[in-house]
Amino acid sequence: MTTVPVTDIQNDLITEFSEDNYPSNKNYEITLRQMSILTHVNNVVDREHNAAVVSSPEEISSQLNEDLFPDDDSPATIIERVQPHTTIIDDTPPPTFRRELLISEQRQQREKRFNITVSKNAEAIMESRSMISSMPTQTPSLGVVYDKDKRIQMLEDEVVNLRNQRSNTKSSDNLDNFTRILFGKTPYKSTEVNKRIAIVNYANLNGSPLSVEDLDVCSEDEIDRIYKTIKQYHESRKRKIIVTNVIIIVINIIEQALLKLGFEEIKGLSTDITSEIIDVEIGDDCDAVASKLGIGNSPVLNIVLFILKIFVKRIKII
């Protein structure tokens, strides 16, 4: 393919070319459409130039003048000079402004070349002979500017930094809220954070790995509903514990009475029946009985029954 030197590139076109006769532009490419257009224009200019060189209008006009207007040495009359019966047809296209402009541009473009000298350190690029002012001497590679892997890595690093900043900020806020709760300076915020801490504590008691940061995705309404549900379950559990303690005390008394009557086989019954077994077997029934009897979450009653249960297990009442 004929080399097509490019003298000027518009800003809206691609500024990347192949490395044909461009030793410093190894990363540049040209589109197929642009290459086909440049090739077509170059071929047209070459054909017109070759046609103009073979038979120029000046040669044809000089030949016609020599034949039609004889010299002084020729005979006096034109009749004496025998002319061949030929017809001269000038099929060369007349010189036009566009054709002359293309020829002159091609001649100028062939004379203009970049002599680029690259230093040993590849830092300085000097332009020795150039009359083209619109093309930059060094064009940055778009592949380096828009490196996909590098951009993804930078975005990932930025996300990690933002997460670290967010976690540090939230940790300081949680610590500040905890100190305010401890010293009772802000009742509203202490109540709000107490709900979250109560939820986390309840989850930890049940073996669930939940933290305060995990509750940040929940709205305040959701926190309120979760806290109310836990509170209702906690009150129900307290009522069941009260009924369970009463059942354990009654079983211990019955066991001692049966042992007093001579039933040795009943020994060890109280140790087999625990609070967990009662909760699994008749836990819901205990809650229903407590609700029907109107037994509420009474801390005093719960403490008294707990102490009484311990003493009944150790002391023989009957």
From Swiss-Prot:
Free-text description of this protein's post-translational modifications in UniProt: Phosphorylated by a OPG054-independent mechanism.
Coiled-coil ranges per UniProt: 145-172
Record keywords: Coiled coil, Host cytoplasm, Late protein, Phosphoprotein
Pfam families, per database record: Pox_A11
Subcellular location: Host cytoplasm
Induction: Expressed in the late phase of the viral replicative cycle.
Family as reported in the entry's similarity comment: Belongs to the orthopoxvirus OPG137 family.
Protein name listed in UniProt: Protein OPG137
Gene that produces this protein: OPG137
